[in-house]
Amino acid sequence: MKKFDEINIIPFIDIMLVLLAIVLVTASFISQGKIQVNVPKASTTQPMKADDLAKLLTITENNEFFFNDQAITKEQLIAEVATWDKSQKVSLKVDGAVAFEKFVELTDILSANEIKNVAIITKKETAPAPSSTPGSPAQVPAVAP
């Protein structure tokens, strides 16, 4: 019978790489948030830092309020915001289908508590693709006579 002089670490490395892949995939899903919201597009969008999401207020298309991905009633939200420091950073994530009235309600709650450091989460608006294809005549804007 053959005696092994060394420990074979190749299977150990294989297992560690699989675990690393699982952790990376899981971490990417966690950072995206759990609540599906179709935010509006804006041309002047700026990337956010991780600390900017310290207080995240969300309104879904069903007009439901969420605070840091936890469902909350309007009354609970008013009580929660009242405990915040006036210099608190707040991010608003509002679905594009939400009535403007709900957005105003949310900003009114913040304004009543003198919270002024507010960011609105939007999607980066992409430039429209050229409508002409290779080999087709370019479109010329019409000029009124």
From Swiss-Prot:
The keyword Magnesium does not apply. Keywords: Cell inner membrane, Cell membrane, Membrane, Protein transport, Transmembrane, Transmembrane helix, Transport. Residues 127-138 have a biased composition (Low complexity). InterPro entries: ExbD, TonB_ExbD_2. This is Biopolymer transport protein ExbD. Residues 126-145 are annotated as: Disordered. The keyword Lyase does not apply. Its main location: membrane. It holds the Pfam family ExbD. GO terms for biological process: protein transport. Residues 31-145 are periplasmic. Belongs to the ExbD/TolR family. GO terms for cellular component: plasma membrane. The accessory proteins ExbB and ExbD seem to form a complex with TonB. It is found in: Cell inner membrane. Involved in the TonB-dependent energy-dependent transport of various receptor-bound substrates. Residues 1-9 are cytoplasmic. It is a single-pass type II membrane protein. The chain crosses the membrane at residues 10-30. Disulfide bonds: none annotated. The lineage of its organism: Bacteria, Pseudomonadati, Pseudomonadota, Gammaproteobacteria, Pasteurellales. GO terms for molecular function: transmembrane transporter activity.
